[in-house]
Regions:
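Outer-membrane beta-barrel porins/channels
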Residues: 25-42, 50, 101, 106, ...
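Bacterial N-terminal signal peptides
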Residues: 10-22
Length: 320
C-alpha cells in the first residue's frame, strides 16, 4: 500500500510539471558545441547539470563538485544544408516568369569559423574541430565552489564553394559565433537539498556575411517589361524624355528582377561581451531534482567593416 501511494505521488508530480510547462523558443545556432555531455542528452540538463559545464546550463550544479576538478572536451562538427528550388503555378514577378533559379539545386558546402581578432579564414574546411576546457575548486568544508570554463554557446559557419550556387542569394558565406573565453562562476550549497549559483561568461562575439542579392519585386519587373517594349537594343528612344529616362541607361541599365543586383559583405565583432547565468537546484530526494536557470541576454555592439557593391544594372539605370 505504501509503494502504491508513492507511485501515485510521483505520477501526480509529473502531471503537475507537464501541465505547467510553457512554450520555448530555440535556434539552430545555440548550444551545438557547448557541451558534449549535454548535447547527447538533448541539452535537457537543467535539473541535472553536468559537472563544470553547469556554468552554462545551471550554475547551481557547481555545488555538487568536490575538491579540484578539470574538464576537457573535444568535438568535430559538419554542418550541411541542402535545397531544391521550384516555382509555383502562375508564378510571375511583374510579368517575368522564367526564374533561372527554378529547377536547380544547391551545390558544394564547406565549414568555416570566426577567428577572434582575425576574422574568417580565406578558405573553408570539410570538418570543424574544437575543444573545451574548464576548472573548478571547492575548499575543504566550504559550501562554495569556484569555477571557470571556455566553451562555445553559439556557433554556425558555412561557405558555399560553388560560385554559381543558386542559394548564393541566401548567403554565400555566413558565420555567427560566440566564444566564451572566461566565465568566473560560483556555486553555493545552502543545505543538502538546495543549491544556488551564478556565472558571468565573458565572450567574443563574431558575425560575418557574404551574400549576393537580387530584388525580385513587381515594380522592378514592370519597369523592365516597359524597357523591353520601348527601348531598342542599340540605343535610346526619341520619346524617352517622356518616359523619365527609361532607356538612358543603355543595355546594361535594363532591369530584370532575377538578375544579381548587388553583393553585401559584413565582418563585425565584439571583443568583450558579458552576460549572466543564475540558477537554482532543489534535490528533495535522490530520485528527483528540480532546476531553474536564468540566462541574461546579450546586447553586444559589434564593430567592423561593411561593403555594398551594386551591379551595373542598378548603377546604369540610376545614372540614366
Amino acid at each position: 500500500m505504501l509503494r502504491s501511494k508513492r507511485w501515485v505521488r510521483r505520477a501526480a508530480g509529473m502531471i503537475v510539471a507537464l501541465a505547467g510547462a510553457g512554450s520555448v523558443q530555440a535556434a539552430m545556432t545555440e548550444n551545438l558545441a557547448t557541451s558534449v555531455t549535454a548535447m547527447s542528452l538533448g541539452n535537457a540538463v537543467t535539473a541535472d547539470p553536468p559537472g563544470i559545464e553547469s556554468i552554462h546550463f545551471n550554475p547551481a550544479g557547481l555545488a555538487r563538485l568536490e575538491g579540484k576538478q578539470k574538464y576537457d572536451s573535444f568535438f568535430a562538427a559538419r554542418f550541411r544544408a541542402w535545397a531544391e528550388f521550384s516555382k509555383p503555378e502562375g508564378f510571375s514577378i511583374g510579368g517575368w516568369t522564367d526564374d533561372p533559379v527554378a529547377g536547380t539545386k544547391t551545390g558544394n558546402f564547406g565549414q568555416t569559423l570566426y577567428v577572434p581578432f582575425r576574422g574568417v579564414p580565406g578558405s573553408s574546411f570539410p570538418v570543424l574541430v574544437g575543444a573545451g576546457l574548464g576548472f573548478s575548486y571547492k575548499p575543504d568544508n566550504s559550501p562554495f565552489t569556484f569555477a571557470t570554463a571556455t566553451y562555445l554557446p553559439q556557433a554556425v559557419g558555412f561557405e558555399r564553394t560553388d560560385a554559381d550556387d543558386p542559394a548564393r542569394f541566401d548567403g554565400r558565406m555566413a558565420v555567427i559565433q560566440r566564444l566564451v573565453y572566461l566565465s568566473p562562476s560560483v556555486g553555493y550549497k545552502v543545505n543538502d537539498q538546495l543549491s544556488v549559483g551564478i556565472a558571468v561568461p565573458i565572450a567574443h562575439q563574431g558575425f560575418a556575411l557574404d551574400t549576393d542579392m537580387r530584388t525580385p519585386n513587381d515594380f522592378l519587373g514592370i519597369v523592365g517589361k516597359l524597357q523591353q517594349g520601348f527601348c531598342p537594343e542599340d540605343g535610346g528612344n526619341p520619346i524617352d524624355m517622356f518616359l523619365f529616362g527609361l532607356c538612358s541607361g543603355g543595355k546594361e541599365g535594363r532591369l530584370n528582377p532575377f538578375k544579381k543586383a548587388a553583393r553585401m559583405q559584413i565582418d563585425a565583432s565584439a571583443a568583450v561581451d558579458l552576460t549572466m547565468n543564475a540558477g537554482v537546484l532543489w534535490e528533495p530526494y535522490d530520485w528527483i531534482s528540480l532546476g531553474g536557470v536564468y540566462r541574461g541576454g546579450s546586447d553586444a555592439v559589434l564593430r567592423g567593416t561593411y561593403r555594398f557593391d551594386t551591379e551595373p544594372m542598378l548603377r546604369e539605370f540610376s545614372a540614366g
